[in-house]
């Protein structure tokens, strides 16, 4: 591992804005957020995967993985981030290093040769070049190659030196954000600047969720100047330093980006959520309050209240038919980050009982919010293996499991329906109408008549009386 990467990791692990990190002792803080991974054995959840997760939703950028093909293919496009324009981010590019390339030291030459066809064929706004375990171990200088390619062909080539063995996926999120801070943010200036320009950081545009929120901001005259990284363009990231306010959606992943932008450019930030009716309203109010503090027209606050009242009324009217069908249902929520409290709060608004919510990838602030919403910490669940998840579903008598697609088989074994609310989902649930869609999905699952048939005993296990199995009438044959 290079000294530059070691220094960057030490800086990220000592993040003052991270509530989890601030509660650690000096010894634990030095140890880092996770154990170092073994080079070559870090597939899934490694730092490289985290960097890809954070940066791949920038849609007009070519993402080139400098590694053997497996590093590129195993984690490609693992989030259903949507684009309103370019589909370039869905194309995969790799140098496909072979053993001979590695042994003979051809890595840097192969990378340089790979950049030319990508730039000439795709005309990307930029090329992000990712290091992996192999290329970090053999010492390929991505910075030098990217600099030479930028000078030769004009397209910005950004090195993202985040090998998998550097640490956990969460660390990779942060290091990916550091690459943007060091190489992209501030590279371009916007043609016009308004007093109502904002950044949205930590939203990945899953299934187009950002599109459910953007119309609300448009109605208030608020412009999303910078987005990291849902449905973002390279220029949006490059101009993010001119925004007036930053909303941080997932602090566990990119708190370092929001804090450093506040330090360098004086942009205040807050953590909010667009899941649920009340949380969406609160986030809109907070954005407007901070914008007014930064010089936006004061009537923005009144216009925000009018918009919130109108949208809340529409949402509650749309939810009215579903409330009696889902009220009282017991929900086990196994997700992570800010959704551990924001989705729980949204479900409670509709009269559902959250019997448990997971504490994966949460900060101390997230835990405090869960306690505030749930009343105590008895409903908190730490990381659960499938066997434990099955036991929790049964012990807590859950009516539905809200989790990721990989947990659907656990729910099926426990004979309870499941709704996908994690990164693999195909339906957006953000904003006011997103909450309506989520409740519709829950209603569609828990009230499906097939569950009664599934839970009923098999005909051969039923009693040999009544209408299930009866002796045929008529004369004996």
UniProtKB/Swiss-Prot annotation:
Family recorded in the similarity comment: Belongs to the NifD/NifK/NifE/NifN family.
Name this polypeptide is given: Nitrogenase iron-molybdenum cofactor biosynthesis protein NifE
Gene Ontology MF terms: nitrogenase activity
NCBIfam families: nifE (TIGR01283)
Family annotation (PANTHER family): NITROGENASE IRON-MOLYBDENUM COFACTOR BIOSYNTHESIS PROTEIN NIFE (PTHR42956:SF1)
UniProt cross-references to SUPFAM superfamilies, sorted A to Z: Helical backbone' metal receptor
Cysteine disulfide links: none
InterPro entries: Nase/OxRdtase_comp1, Nase_comp1_CS, NifE, NifE-like
Biological role stated in the UniProt entry: This protein may play a role in the biosynthesis of the prosthetic group of nitrogenase (FeMo cofactor).
Pathway: Cofactor biosynthesis; Fe-Mo cofactor biosynthesis
Short name of any one Pfam family annotated for the protein: Oxidored_nitro
Assigned keywords, A-Z: Nitrogen fixation
Superkingdom of this protein's organism: Bacteria
Key word Endoplasmic reticulum present: no
GO biological process, one term: protein-containing complex assembly
